[in-house]
Amino acid sequence: MPNLSKSKYITFCQCPKALWLKQYKPEEIVIDPLVQARFDSGTQVGELAKRLFGDFVEATTYIQTDDTAQRLDLRAMTVLTQKAIAEGVENIAEAAFLYGGCYCAVDILHKTPQGYAIYEVKSSTDLSQLDVYAQDVAYQKYVLANCGINVTGTYLVNIDNEYVLDGEFDVKGFFNINDISQAVANEYPKVPGRVAQAKKMLEGNEPQRDLGEYCHKPYDCPFWEYCSRGIVPHPSVFDLYRMSFKKSLEHMHEGRITLEDMRNEKLSDTQQLQLECTLGNKTYINKDGIKEFLTKLSYPLYFLDFETEQTVIPKYQGTHPYQQVTFQYSLHYIEHEGGELKHTEFLGDGKTDPRRALAEQLCHDIPLNVCTTAYNKAFECTRLKELAEAYPDLAPHIINIRDHIVDLLDPFRAGYYYKPAMNGSFSIKKVLPALFPDDLQLDYHNLSGGVQNGGEAMNIYPLMASMTVEERKKTRRALLDYCCLDTLAMVKLWEKLRKVSEE
């Protein structure tokens, strides 16, 4: 039987079935790109944390499985770890231990006068998931204790969200070290029983389990699509606008799963509109509401969209962990009624801090006191506020832009225009294909270059700095095309609103 790793143990704690599927049906895993990006950032943080206590020995060892793939060589890692312990090494990174089919690699094993302390590294900035972290570390302590290691302390290393890059990067200032011994002590007695249960379950057939809160708590399960297949129809109660997952589960467990089942339930106005339009396969248009919204727009009219990067490790002076750094914008505009649609844009180089140049060009491209639209303007307004704070000399103009932004999301969120294809979402990625189902020009899936959503843009931009000239050129084009489509989409939505209000 395969070894039970700490990640598998944590999966078992959330849902035993998920562990079985991870072991025997990994092809069913579906991971959101943003979740994968968080995993990747966690790896970066782990590498950085190894420097916390000075010199260290790295136990990580790989074995080549074919020309392109590698996997961890667990046996070699445990041998290297034991050698480092015998030599009195003070810090061992990824210290590996194997006991009775249970395997773990400790992020940092730090020598103390009486034994060793476990330091578990997380890319979080708070302790909101302390119960899960304690399960993780308790499992490690269990394995180490059974390997004869005297564990003298258990600590969680996470990110200080108040850290600001000022001069040289300070690895000690970047991290917080938290003593979680009490939380680990509370979890420790549960480990042997859970380990036995997990091993027994893995020896059997696929377990049966109902959908529950654990499907998304504490983490989104990558097997949701697999487990809900054949159980949850489309559309369903899970698609109702702003209905919590917990509430949707309650309805499902009481026998209400389809929208038809929800006819006699108390719903919000928007949910009721969604239900009626979907079941009746009809479009709802409130012309008066749309006309009232359109009176808020005036020429010259600008359509603005930002893209940001959000790195866990600050890259630019004055920034903090996970700060949204605006690196790109697209701007379509029409100067007067019947005027030509024009476009301008900005994109950083991926190497230097793009914010000052972006802010300067934005102030040049958008005059004072003009009407600008954004889709879900809270995002753009927050970025503008941050730019104004970073560059006080540009602040008056930037704040003026912010104060004249009208949200193009408003008429859709208000329910003035609804089509069944929106499926309870007013995201531009849902609204656009619902209103223009046959317009290939507006289909994000037709974009080439690997950038078809904001998450992909966020992930690929930081990589530009290390790309070849040809790769950078291709990526730059892909980013420009994607962001341009966002603002073109806004123009098309505005035109559609004008058209239906006049029909």
Regions from the language model: what does each represent?
Residues 97, 289-368, 389:
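Conserved RNase H-like, two-metal-ion catalytic cores of nucleic-acid enzymes
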Residues 2, 8, 37-39, 45, ...:
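Cys/His-rich finger/ribbon microdomains and the adjacent scaffold used
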Residues 121-129:
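Short beta-strand-loop-alpha-helix junction that forms the active-site gateway
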Residues 15, 108, 140, 221, ...:
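A residue-level signal for conserved active-site and pocket-lining positions in enzyme catalytic cores
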Residues 1-114, 245-283:
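Metal-dependent nuclease catalytic cores that hydrolyze phosphodiester bonds in DNA/RNA
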Residues 28, 127-128, 163-164, 258-259, ...:
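Flexible loop/turn segments at secondary-structure boundaries
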Residues 162-234, 254, 431-503:
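Acidic, Mg2+-coordinating catalytic module of metal-dependent nucleases/exonucleases
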Residues 89-97, 103-107, 118-121, 133-198, ...:
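Conserved DEDDh/DEDDy metal-dependent 3′-5′ exonuclease domain
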